[in-house]
Structure formats: C-alpha cells, structure tokens
C-alpha cells in the first residue's frame, strides 16, 4: 500500500527538498493552500486536500482539514481490525506522516501594528488538531512540527521504509510541547486583553536558550530558558562580544545587575555586584569617574564580580577595568578601542552589550519563585517613588547634600538582600550590610566596612527599624542622616533616638524587602 504524507506548513524552509525526497521514496503527498502551490511550482506532485475530503476549503481557509477523511486517516489504529474496517467502509485513506507547523501567532502579536482581529485570525485550529491526532496515534503515524527533524525522518524512511517507534514517540512528545506552548501564548494574549490579573489557571511557556554544564553547584543539572515572547531588556537579549558561555550563577548575577542599573538613568553610573548583592555603586559626571567610585567603594569584593555600566565604555575606563579580574562586564556599547583593551589577553572575560533604552519598550515581567509543590508570582519591585512624597520625621531637616545622598542611598538599598543596610554619600556606596537575620547586625557590618569614610555619609534601610538600638548604633558611628520606610509600631522610639542625637531621618513609606 502506498504511504501517504500530509504536508501543510507556514514555515516553508526545507519543505520542497523534504517532499522531493519523499516522492522519490514512493510516497503520495496531500497538501493545502500555499504549501501545495510551493510544492507544485517545484514540480512535486501533490493531491489537493479537497480531493481527499470531497469538500472545498471554505470561510477564508478556516475550514479545510477538519474532516473525518483526514482525522480518520490519522487516528485509525493499524493494530485494531475494527478501525481498519471502518476506514475501508467509509473510504478513508490512511495517512502515515504529518508535517505541519502552525500559523505564526507569536510573530503576529509581536508586530507593533497588530490588531485584535489580526491576532485572532492567526490562531490556528486545523493545524493543532492534525498534530494532536497524529501524535496521539504515534504508534503508527509520524508527526513532524520542526524542520530540524526532516533529516532524521527521511534517513529512517530511506533506510527501513518507516521511522522507528522511539523516533515517533520522541516527535509526538515534541508536538504536544509545541501545541501546549502555542495554546499558552494564545491564553496569555486573551488573558491580558480582558485584564484578568489573577487567572485560575497559569500556563507559561519558555524556549530553551542554552543548555548549561551545571546549576548553582556542580551536582545540580540546569538549563537556561527565555520567555517565549522576547523581552528586549534582558540577559537573554544581550549580545555577547567576548568570553566563555554564561554559567547559571553568571546569569543570575547579570540579571541582578541589570535590574539595579535600570534605576540609575540620569547620571553615568557603575554598579559592581557579587552574589546578587551590590558591593560598589558609583555615579559621577563621566563613566570613568563613576567607575573610580564604584571600585573605591569596595576594591576587595569586586574581584571576580560583575560590573554593569549605563553609558558607553570608553578607552580610559577600559584601561582602568582591564587589570581587575572580572567575570562579566555589561554596557550599552563599547568604543572600538575600549573593546580591544578589554579583550586583550582576556579570552574568558564575558563582555555583554545590552541596549539600556530597550527597557523603555520592554514589558516588566512578573517574577516567579519556585516553592515545593507550587509557584509564587508577584510584580517586580519597580514602583516609581518621588522624594516629594517622603516625610521628614525628625526635628532636624536634611541638608541639600544629605537629600542627594539619601536619594542615591535609597535607590541602592532596594537591591541589597534583606535585612539590607547601605551607607553612601552622594557619589558612592561606602558600606553594605546584606542578608543578616537581625537588622542591627546588618547595621554593624555596613558601619564596619565604611568606618573611615563616614564624614557626610547617610544610611538607608530596606525596611523599618524594629527597635531604637539601630538608630543608637548609627549615631554612635557618626552618621547624621537615615532614610527608611517607617511603619514599625515602635517608630516613635526610633524618632526620639534620632532627635536625641541630632540626626535627621526620612520615612519613604515604601518597603523593599529582597529575599
């Protein structure tokens, strides 16, 4: 019995050559619409879909393959006599191979000029139905959704007359992943269209970006997946100009770095980061001077760290960075001279280019945190704050310099692991106290790091002070200005302590926990 293939693709890469080889192997080809035209023009003999169904394509192509003569040919089990008899009785020809890819729904909704009606018209119905029918009956039917699988399928058919069961099973699994992802994108689009922010079912789809050697530790397997709807301002979208592949820990640190730098737009800023905590942040009138401040903030911790800059890296800045061992540098661009300097004898240094203005057009994604048996979903902490909304709660008002330093410190504190404390002036971080289980311990760590540079310094806390002992420690160190969210039942104790020592303290009303 002659084998039959049904081919209907939107991605026509390689399909003519694939069909030509099938016909050489004695296969009949059923085809539809534009695919049939392409094959006919290439001299490949095809059977029109309406010759199989006995029913014309209609409703602008919405109805063409949804027919028993198609799905019966796909779903009939070859090992069940009653199925074969039913096919014979109803003159349904068996179909042994399906090659289908779907209407470009994702590409359509990414178009800047997309309309709702256009998106709806690009929802494929017949394609997924054929794929699912063929995949369900993979014991007998081969189903192909990815042109990358054409050589394997052709090779096995040429060698043994049909594909192997393991290949059919693998391809069926790929199809179900593909159709599930396709439906997930459609569901996400409609969910956003109707403004549903707490759907009772959450289905998200990501595409494999990079297999990884291992995860956070060598004993952990890992891979890097990216959002199926690309986000321009992301590590997945960054262009790598030099160095080894990014590791699992590199990607997490790099992601933390670009989250931090996005809050510093107005002035040239450099952030040095280690284990997802900022170890040095500097801002100035030039990117070179901002680097100087970031490096000076903590010249020890920056070793083996990540540096992100919000302006083009010039030769002068590159000359200063080059002697330092860094894992990654991220910037919107590099001068040719700077790139030559940074890559000289530094083949492992990962240099990434990421357009920072891309964040203006990028959707701010939800954050997902896996827990045993579930998933936590939240908005990113990207609230826009205005110092005009802050409240001075002490008798002493901040000076102009203290206001500038507190604004800088508050932006910086947002990305320190809780309990997070950061000490800065208006140019650079001076001390960082991250991730302690009590806040006063974080205060002490930050003070110890900043101890000889506290003149004119301010301190920021990512959450309120539960007790006045924090303020007492701060005052004893000689720091004169504090910025914190407020909100403790003992706020007045902290205010009284600040007044006792002549400190100024500002409440922002916004907490920035980071676990």
Swiss-Prot record:
Q: Which keywords describe this protein according to UniProt?
A: Hydrolase, Multifunctional enzyme, Purine biosynthesis, Transferase
Which residues belong to any copy of the MGS-like domain? 1-145
Return the domain comment text from this UniProt entry.
The IMP cyclohydrolase activity resides in the N-terminal region.
Which reaction(s) does its UniProt entry say it catalyses?
A: (6R)-10-formyltetrahydrofolate + 5-amino-1-(5-phospho-beta-D-ribosyl)imidazole-4-carboxamide = 5-formamido-1-(5-phospho-D-ribosyl)imidazole-4-carboxamide + (6S)-5,6,7,8-tetrahydrofolate; IMP + H2O = 5-formamido-1-(5-phospho-D-ribosyl)imidazole-4-carboxamide
Enzyme Commission number(s): 2.1.2.3, 3.5.4.10
Q: Which organism is it from?
A: Streptococcus suis (strain 05ZYH33)
**Pathway where it operates:** Purine metabolism; IMP biosynthesis via de novo pathway; 5-formamido-1-(5-phospho-D-ribosyl)imidazole-4-carboxamide from 5-amino-1-(5-phospho-D-ribosyl)imidazole-4-carboxamide (10-formyl THF route): step 1/1; Purine metabolism; IMP biosynthesis via de novo pathway; IMP from 5-formamido-1-(5-phospho-D-ribosyl)imidazole-4-carboxamide: step 1/1
User: Any keyword Hydrolase?
Assistant: yes
What lineage does UniProt assign to this protein's organism? Answer: Bacteria, Bacillati, Bacillota, Bacilli, Lactobacillales
GO molecular function: any one? phosphoribosylaminoimidazolecarboxamide formyltransferase activity
What would be the name of the gene that encodes this protein?
purH
What is the protein named? Bifunctional purine biosynthesis protein PurH
PANTHER family (alphabetical): BIFUNCTIONAL PURINE BIOSYNTHESIS PROTEIN ATIC, BIFUNCTIONAL PURINE BIOSYNTHESIS PROTEIN PURH
Listed GO CC annotations: cytosol
List GO BP terms, alphabetically. Answer: 'de novo' IMP biosynthetic process
What family does the entry list?
Answer: Belongs to the PurH family.
InterPro entries per the UniProt record, alphabetical:
AICAR_Tfase_dup_dom_sf, Cytidine_deaminase-like, MGS-like_dom, MGS-like_dom_sf, PurH-like
